Amino acid sequence: MAKVVETPLMKQYFDIKAKHPDAILLFRVGDFYEMYGEDAVIGAEILGIVQTKRANGVGQHVEMAGFPHHALDSYLPKLVRAGKRVAICDQLEDPKLTKKLVKRGITELVTPGVSINDNILNHKENNFLASIHFAKEVCGISFLDISTGEFMTAEGSIDYIDKLLNNFSPKEVLIERGNKKRFEEAFGPRFFIFELDDWIFTTSAAEDRLLKHFETKNLKGFGVQHLKLGIIASGAILYYLDQTQHTHISHITALSRIEEDRYVRLDKFTVRSLELVGTMNDEGTSLLDVIDKTISPMGSRMLRRWILFPLKDVKPIQERQEVVDYFFREPETKELLDTQLEQIGDLERIISKVAVGRVSPREVVQLKVALRAIEPIKEACMASGEPSLCRIGEQLNACALIRDRIEKEINNDPPSLVNKGGIIAKGVNEELDDLRAIAYSGKDYLLKVQQREIELTGIPSLKIAFNNVFGYYIEVRNTHKDKVPANWIRKQTLVNAERYITEELKEYEEKILGAEEKILALETRLFNELVLALTEYIPPIQMNANLIGRIDCLLSFAKAAEANKYIRPVVSDSDKIDIKGGRHPVIEKQLPLGEPYIANDVYLDDEKQQIIIITGPNMAGKSALLRQTALITLMAQIGCFVPAESAHIGIVDKIFTRVGASDNISVGESTFMVEMNEASDILNNMTSRSLVLFDELGRGTSTYDGISIAWAIVEYIHEHPNAKAKTLFATHYHELNEMERAFKRIKNYNVSVKEVGNKVIFLRKLIPGGSEHSFGIHVAKMAGMPKSIVKRSNEILKQLESENRQEGITGKPVKAIASAAEGYQLSFFQLDDPVLSQVRDEIKNLDVNNLTPLEALNKLIEIKRIITGK
């Protein structure tokens, strides 16, 4: 882009652009927002608008693209969703009042993580900005949703921070400059990151910002004073808000600690494989989709967080259950609350807009409607007699004074923009009423003048009109221009008519136009005074929004339970999971009409049945059974009713899944490496209160490697002295059925099938005992495999089975392992073979507890070389 002698406008543009080189600059010129240079090229492509050129000095030009200023709300979201930071540069003075270049400046910097624009935000999700501060072994992290005022912090291991990033899904992450590689190594490349200077991430700078914002002497009142790394991350967020011109943030009233010990640990693999809030394909259905019957945006956002952060304490779970139970017993109350919740709207985000000074007149009216609806909700809660609902009712505040003031001062159906006028109600301000009388009676006055002049001049076609060039005028056709009085002043000659002005019209014009300007200024002032008064009500209205969200979530649970025939589970501190007639909440909703879901029982405890090995053919329903057990457990621990005939859930502290293939090929990891990494994470972090799901572990390697690893992992879980994790282990390795004989808390089950001739019918029923057949060839046939391949597969299978029987392979080595199992040792390492003896010694000397996944893989390769001699 050539640049020699710039025009004053372009010089002003480049000066402002230099301060925000990493943002697309929307530069206000008259009624348009314009982009220049590279911004124009990028913006035109994203927005699908025409790219053109603007003159920039003699013989120079610059690329340009733009759109009308009133279309900002349509185009801005497209830029932000494309991952762009957008600097909005407005005219800071009225062009009519200056003969020089209009002053311009940045009024807002919108980024993916910092926005209050409704067209950018998803009302069902939070829009979090995150900040991370790295130390040697741990990190501090902070999350802020400027659209709701929620501000949270935590610190912990890389693994814990990764879990939080996955669950909160921030739209933007702030990091120290130069830490991009470290961040991506720890958390992957999936986040939009922005680098800030190192000095911003210092203790003193961060504490100063936080104390200044909250106007406190220390942070003890927030319970975060010991989270030094979290405080640094939080301070960086406040700095970033200041840099992006978001300085009015009185709605950020607290910094809360994310309490790790309150919630069940769900890693990103578990959240993804259980499809809790999202699906693996566009056509899928998540758990959230099934149980989300919320009405308010606050309820939708809260339910999403409840699902991702199940509770570990029995008491708050039971309190939620009691409310859901109450709604079942009192359908009239449920109906009343439903009706009132529909009136609430996005109370949380509206009051945040009040704080930042971006609330519209219509949103203020919606605020009034919401506060009016809170009164009957409060009364219903207080009258319920249910302790949790009564506590909610006590805290709800209808804010009657400000509600009544809005009712009195704002028209019921105002325009969305202040500058459109017609906002302030009649009778609020005497001066405003007088000005309106002048401005709005103008039409009648002009009609009277027009009729009078027709009668005086005898010109029947005479008419009075207005344009922006010379204001009010009288138009007379040429056939009557000889009748025009001498005191009329001619202003314009048309083909068929002449236009005139009079002193009377000019005086009236000044009066009426002056009145309109004064009306707009006065309405704007009165509206801003009301908004300022509203800022005093931010804390109670934020509390209302939170409580409404809670009621909405619990109502949603009741509606989902009623619609889907869920029951109330017993939740306790026991060590058992006892599910009778359990169903998969998502799959049962996808079955064809009239087809029943085959329910199954699952029982796990620490004494008799800690581990269930599930065998059965592919497509029989093993994976669904694993997932439904985890989902029922999770639903119980968020206070929801569950799809079962009965359920007793002993609290779990962590849910682990190794379900399905999840190759991370993009970073060079194979299926097997991913399996081993995930399995290692489970084995190193499980406790006696954990629920562990393994589905087809070992598929990424050879059969005997797979069997060996699967056996060793199951044995390790069974024999671990301090972590008897309740485990469901689905496998196609039927050899693992032998483990039941050697380990008292391992039990075999299979998902039953029925053979009819050459066909297989999947019964999908879990029954005791192992399965000896995989029916893989039957599944291939069902999948439409060519008949010749199916036939040849059967021939090869029979040949292999015959050879194995002749050589005595089938079952014998595995049974030998089971019968001689001792401690952690696998019995086939006790055979009289010098090579296997060497392997046994290698494994004996391993420090399993301190072995990293990579070291384990290298050791496996070394053992393979010993066995194969290669």
From Swiss-Prot:
MF annotations from Gene Ontology: ATP binding; ATP-dependent DNA damage sensor activity; damaged DNA binding; mismatched DNA binding
PANTHER family assigned to the protein according to its UniProt record, in alphabetical order: DNA MISMATCH REPAIR PROTEIN MSH1, MITOCHONDRIAL (PTHR11361:SF34), DNA MISMATCH REPAIR PROTEIN MUTS FAMILY MEMBER (PTHR11361)
NCBIfam families, sorted: mutS1, PRK05399.1
Protein keywords: ATP-binding, DNA damage, DNA repair, DNA-binding, Nucleotide-binding
Binding site for ATP: G616, P617, N618, M619, A620, G621, K622, S623
Pfam families xref list: MutS_I, MutS_II, MutS_III, MutS_IV, MutS_V
UniProt superkingdom: Bacteria
Its biological purpose: This protein is involved in the repair of mismatches in DNA. It is possible that it carries out the mismatch recognition step. This protein has a weak ATPase activity.
Keyword set includes Nucleotide-binding: yes
Family: Belongs to the DNA mismatch repair MutS family.
Name used for this protein in its record: DNA mismatch repair protein MutS
SMART domains: MUTSac, MUTSd
An example Gene Ontology CC term for this record: cytosol
Gene field: mutS
InterPro entries found in the cross-reference section: DNA_mismatch_repair_MutS, DNA_mismatch_repair_MutS-lik_N, DNA_mismatch_repair_MutS/MSH, DNA_mismatch_repair_MutS_C, DNA_mismatch_repair_MutS_clamp, DNA_mismatch_repair_MutS_core, DNA_mismatch_repair_MutS_N, DNA_mismatch_repair_MutS_sf
One Gene Ontology term from the biological process aspect of the record: mismatch repair
Record organism: Parabacteroides distasonis (strain ATCC 8503 / DSM 20701 / CIP 104284 / JCM 5825 / NCTC 11152)
